[in-house]
Swiss-Prot record:
GO biological process, one term: D-alanine biosynthetic process
Keywords: Isomerase, Pyridoxal phosphate
Organism for this UniProt entry: Vibrio vulnificus (strain CMCP6)
HAMAP family membership: Ala_racemase (MF_01201)
Protein name (database record): Alanine racemase
Pathway: Amino-acid biosynthesis; D-alanine biosynthesis; D-alanine from L-alanine: step 1/1
Family to which the UniProt record says this protein belongs: Belongs to the alanine racemase family.
Function: Catalyzes the interconversion of L-alanine and D-alanine. May also act on other amino acids.
InterPro entries (UniProt xref): Ala_racemase, Ala_racemase/Decarboxylase_C, Ala_racemase_C, Ala_racemase_N, Ala_racemase_pyridoxalP-BS, PLP-binding_barrel
Domain of life according to the entry: Bacteria
One Pfam family cited in the UniProt record for this chain: Ala_racemase_N
Ligand binding (substrate): R129, M302
Listed cofactors: pyridoxal 5'-phosphate
GO CC entries: cytosol
Length: 358
């Protein structure tokens, strides 16, 4: 019997991609598959993301993995290249790059490349993480247009800081600034990621860049993906390896952080922080055992966690436990833990078995 297993529903992935296309019908779709496809398996996700027009990654190694497994669609390096030594690799493997700073621009100007590279100029429209500031924009555009190592036309992008907050005034300001700077430009543009394409239709430009929503996880704090019509792609499962009688007043686990208020049965599940399940999960965090919600009871260990099955439980060793998935949204689990579902799905360790269904 396997211990922790992440079951990846590739049919759900395809459903989600089709729904994205329906919601952004006039945009091309750049599927973001960074961080090992948000923990879902880079190669499997790319192979089955048949509705994608291109892929977005964070590291050059991810782009090379995609090329190695036969992906021929465009691939964009979302953080851009890290050093001038990366540029020949981009050319050889037909990888597009973001340019967001002076250092990258100088490397492009000084390089001797066999063919030009497709460049997306990243504009800092208000998030202040990466990108050229508005007052630098025109100078960057002129230098990129003059650079023989840059394929023409130049492309343009930015990123939202608060698109998941509908009442935040920052997003309309970012949209207005980006559109005003790029109005009349010949090159294609991209502004919306998951929250943007769902909540800010005016940000659906020539390209959208869905990430977390593609995997059936919501970018919003007040709605699950299921409530938006999307299907969770990952279900994290394990099983009971012990069912123990615990008396009222007895504690369970390291630090004795949970003390039973009644005679009950406690289930021990074969998963822990060594598998990527957060050690910070507090007492009360929900787990599904045989289809019903039961609370974590006691501190999460490296290889195990414990749940209060209740005094009348009839569960047995070997019974299934679901940590998150179709019937227990990762968003709900994350909220109990005080994190975001992005972190849950991307932090599973190599010890977790990956199982794919088509």
């Amino acid at each position: 019997m396997k211990a922790a297993t992440a079951c990846i529903d590739l049919v759900a992935l395809q459903h989600n991609l089709q729904l994205i296309k329906q919601q952004a019908p006039h945009s091309k779709l750049m599927a973001v598959v960074k961080a090992n496809g948000y923990g879902h398996g880079l190669r499997h996700v790319a192979k089955h993301a048949v509705g994608a027009d291109a892929f977005g990654v964070a590291r050059i190694e991810e782009a090379l993995q995609l090329r190695a497994c036969g992906v021929v669609k465009p691939i964009l390096l979302l953080e851009g290249f890290y050093s001038s030594g990366d540029l020949p690799v981009l050319v050889t493997n037909n990888i597009q790059t973001v340019v967001h700073c002076e250092e990258q621009l100088r490397d492009l100007e000084n390089a001797e490349l066999e063919t030009p590279v497709v460049v997306w100029l990243k504009i800092d429209s208000g998030m202040h993480r990466l990108g050229v500031r508005p007052e630098q924009y025109q100078a960057f555009v002129e230098r990129l247009h003059q650079c023989p190592n840059v394929a023409k036309p130049l492309r343009y992008m930015s990123h939202f800081g608060c698109a998941d907050e509908m009442n935040n005034e920052m997003t309309p300001k970012q949209i207005e600034l980006f559109l005003s700077l790029t109005r009349g430009c010949k090159g294609e543009r991209s502004l919306a990621a998951s929250a943007g394409l769902l909540a800010w239709q005016e940000s659906q430009l020539e390209w959208v860049r869905p990430g977390i929503i593609m995997y059936g996880v919501s970018p919003f704090g007040d709605k699950t993906a299921s409530e938006l019509g999307y299907k969770p792609v990952m279900t994290l499962k394990s099983h009971l390896i012990a069912v123990r009688d615990v008396k009222a007043g007895e504690s369970v686990g390291y630090g004795a952080t949970w003390i039973s208020e009644r005679d009950t049965k406690v289930g021990v599940i074969a998963i822990g922080y060594g598998d990527g399940y957060p050690r910070t999960a507090p007492n009360g965090t929900p787990v599904l055992v045989n289809g019903r919600k039961v609370p974590i009871a006691g501190r999460v260990s490296m290889d195990m966690l414990t749940v209060d099955l209740g005094p009348d439980a009839t569960d047995h060793v070997g019974d299934e436990a679901i940590l998150w998935g179709a019937d227990l949204p990762a968003e709900d689990v994350a909220q109990h833990i005080g994190t975001i579902a992005y972190e849950l799905v991307t932090k599973l360790t190599s010890r977790v078995e990956m199982s794919y269904s088509e």
